[in-house]
Amino acid sequence: MLGDGKEGTSTIPGFNQIQFEGFYRFIDQGLIEELSKFPKIEDIDHEIEFQLFVETYQLVEPLIKERDAVYESLTYSSELYVSAGLIWKTSRNMQEQRIFIGNIPLMNSLGISIVNGIYRIVINQILQSPGIYYQSELDHNGISVYTGTIISDWGGRLELEIDKKARIWARVSRKQKISILVLSSAMGSNLREILENVCYPEIFLSFLTDKEKKKIGSKENAILEFYQQFSCVGGDPIFSESLCKELQKKFFHQRCELGRIGRRNINWRLNLNIPQNNIFLLPRDILAAADHLIGMKFGMGTLDDMNHLKNKRIRSVADLLQDQLGLALARLENVVKGTIGGAIRHKLIPTPQNLVTSTPLTTTYESFFGLHPLSQVLDRTNPLTQIVHGRKLSYLGPGGLTGRTANFRIRDIHPSHYGRICPIDTSEGINVGLIGSLSIHARIGDWGSLESPFYELFEKSKEARIRMLFLSPSQDEYYMIAAGNSLALNRDIQEEQAVPARYRQEFLTIAWEEVNLRSIFPFQYFSIGASLIPFIEHNDANRALMSSNMQRQAVPLSRSEKCIVGTGLERQVALDSGVPAIAEHEGKILSTDTEKIILSGDGNTISIPLIMYQRSNKNTCMHQKPQVRRGKCIKKGQILADGAATVGGELALGKNILVAYMPWEGYNFEDAVLISECLVYGDIYTSFHIRKYEIQTHVTTQGPERITKEIPHLEGRLLRNLDKNGIVMLGSWVETGDILVGKLTPQVAKESSYAPEDRLLRAILGIQVSTSKETCLKLPIGGRGRVIDVRWVQKKGGTSYNPEIIRVYISQKREIKVGDKVAGRHGNKGIISKILPRQDMPYLQDGRPVDMVFNPLGVPSRMNVGQIFECSLGLAGSLLDRHYRIAPFDERYEQEASRKLVFSELYEASKQTANPWVFEPEYPGKSRIFDGRTGDPFEQPVIIGKPYILKLIHQVDDKIHGRSSGHYALVTQQPLRGRSKQGGQRVGEMEVWALEGFGVAHILQEMLTYKSDHIRARQEVLGTTIIGGTIPKPEDAPESFRLLVRELRSLALELNHFLVSEKNFQINRKEV
């Protein structure tokens, strides 16, 4: 949050700030912390010592640019160098060298890393904060059982529980529990120290039996008893150093390391003053926790809410990268130890450079970015998607929850989420409530807590002043917080006497004088996606959730358009996404073209490259269009070029189109949408999609594969687009089945397949004749388009043969068509059902045909009335040539503020354009419209307007699929499933019932045999169909039935069937 120099005013923080602040924290603090933990390494004879000098570490600037790293499939990383010393203790000599430890992937200003040419982002994780938590549960008798759970920094748990006899146990697993006296003794306390450090010594003495006294008589006895209980070991184990090490590794390291945050939380909860650098659980902690547990039993103290955000911590990108660095340095330590030992055994003189290898660090980070669940491929469908992806919060991942084990209470909205986690924006399906989104103003504090800003109100010198505070979830419970519906920042302005406020997770109505804090912004509670929905306060939250998800699926259109009705955040979203090109210096434009803009300033000439037809990982087209003219003087920060889905530096995901809410011959039944052919012919909803096809050359046992145009046994028609090297030419139009890259793979043919002249050459001259198999890259079904780019990448490797990858990029122009999905910004989504000629569409009183017809029944039941306000205000804005930016919850200005604004704008539009039908007082917002087929008016007036409608990535071209023949599963011999595998349509149990119900026996038999898994019958069908014969009936069982028989046999069940003769009742047994 940035103050702009005035009291009580502020600007919205950068939306990518949370990511690159975390990365900066890792570089500035985490890197030094982990390097300083690297131990001094000695050989077995203690003659040589290896150590790192952390103060001299250096990160080198990358040698390649981000764009080159993407094109060449490389990692945009920095090399880490550290000074290392090798000390010979006998001669006291030291050799110091600057060594290369490995590559650390860098993050750009947008919070994105590039690993192996792929844009990746690390999302933040919410974990249970380490510390102690008290809870109460009812047992089977209905009696409250109190427990205290100590959670370590690693996620390990140790439970303290008190039973009916007031005995305190430590539960180390679900079945094993041990007396707290034994645990404290095993951790180093004697009985006297225990009784001196507790508030209720008589309770501890009450369950001290003679057997218990023997167990805690000495530390060794206590450790042996604890080891037996913890490891479930029978017999009498003997106390030894190895036993202590095993216990240390299995129990104390996993369950007793609290970390910095855990130590702070336990000190605060148990009123202790143990130093912050003491990060392990102490006997004093255990005894204080037991005291609090006894207090809970007697009704003193408060239980903990596990779902409160004060009991959670955010594991940010800094923590994840620091953990990986620690893991890599531990591996490096083992490598150095092994190398020193090997050098001494072979009597070699080691040097610091010879001892260290860069492999552990480089491979650890590559595997982290490639395999870790919290490192995800950046979704680049549109600019909004890129920003929202980096602001996700996940309960899932290592150390977190899973979609199947998380209960409803964890998924639900909690009052502590206010201003920190968006109550609306979450995923749909099994992960609902487990993946959330940060609120706009939230930030991550020093202790891993989510902080939200508030204005503090206080009086000084009879003058009301305002100051901004960032509060963690544990702090804002103690303040009366006004809920943001009080308008003035200045106390001089008369306020309402009573205002709604929040206090200790309750909503109250209090006098204005009692308010301590107030919200700073109407958007403070929402994420970016939810903040882009106008009139969100008039929508049901479920529909707002759908809308915030669907905006991220909007496809950038070929001709973008600003929304007439917006919320005011569109500009910042576009700027922070990095999609528009922005001037970094002021100067004068020398020239502009589609590839670059040349700018002169401060005596220098700067060339700014523009993105041209770049493919995103969702196959959408990223493209920049210059917005400045030659000779124009520009200032720093001015927009030079608009990107995909931005116009004038504002987010533009869809189009403002004329819509009517009315039924039309059933074509908009169940959310279907009727559209005009104008949207197709006018390229209103046309988008470009770029697909990538690649092929790699390998070295086989018979020799290397070749890229060539000379492909035998293929029609010349398929090879028409290849150049002399065998690669498709730029700009050529390709159809399904065309060869994109010609490739031959060598193989040795059998003796019988040689031609006579080949056999003669082999017999006389001994020449080995090899044949080749064509393994060309062919364009799959649905891939037709224009070749816009070809890249031939040679991978750098240590082998003698470096594989080559050839990538072909093909652009498709897609108009809107039947089956495509469209949506508004209020969760109103639908599939195009029919494209009508413009003359048949309903038309307005001024003769304009509408572009789209929605079903009016989709509004009242879904309770998303915001679309009606947007629709009507959009119509007024288009007639008045105005754009509106409306903050949410405008009802705080006055009652019915939204309706008054819309009606007043419609009335003004009606007056200025001399069109009385725009605002008719009898039915405001509605109008009489006419049937385009007959010219007659419809019976009822209809709501018409101009809402902002998006075209989504779910397009029929990517989904439609058919199969004539293809691959079969090896076991069941049935067709595979799915479009990607060229699979078949499943005929399930209910489909069989439907066919049985209509008595179509032959069709049913075909479905279950020829078209499915009867191997011999389906082979015979082809031949008989070609010659025109009758299709033979299958005599034996299909393969899936045979599979069932085999599975029954594996369970020792034999299945047979018999034929009984009608004449003599002879039984003939037949094999199944």
From Swiss-Prot:
Record's subcellular location: Plastid, Chloroplast
UniProt source species: Arabis hirsuta (Hairy rock-cress)
Primary localization: plastid
Cross-referenced SUPFAM superfamilies: beta and beta-prime subunits of DNA dependent RNA-polymerase
Enzyme Commission number: 2.7.7.6
Protein's name in the database: DNA-directed RNA polymerase subunit beta
InterPro entries (alphabetical): DNA-dir_RNA_pol_bsu_ext_1_sf (IPR042107), DNA-dir_RNA_pol_su2 (IPR015712), DNA-dir_RNAP_su2_dom (IPR007120), DNA-dir_RNAP_su2_hyb_sf (IPR037033), RNA_pol_bsu_bac (IPR010243), RNA_pol_bsu_CS (IPR007121), RNA_pol_Rpb2_2 (IPR007642), RNA_pol_Rpb2_2_sf (IPR037034)
Keyword Transferase attached: yes
CDD domains named among the record's database cross-references: RNA_pol_B_RPB2 (cd00653)
A GO CC term assigned to this protein in UniProt: chloroplast
Family: Belongs to the RNA polymerase beta chain family.
Gene name for this UniProt entry: rpoB
Known function: DNA-dependent RNA polymerase catalyzes the transcription of DNA into RNA using the four ribonucleoside triphosphates as substrates.
Catalytic activity from the UniProt record: RNA(n) + a ribonucleoside 5'-triphosphate = RNA(n+1) + diphosphate
PANTHER family: DNA-DIRECTED RNA POLYMERASE I SUBUNIT 2
Gene Ontology BP, a term: DNA-templated transcription
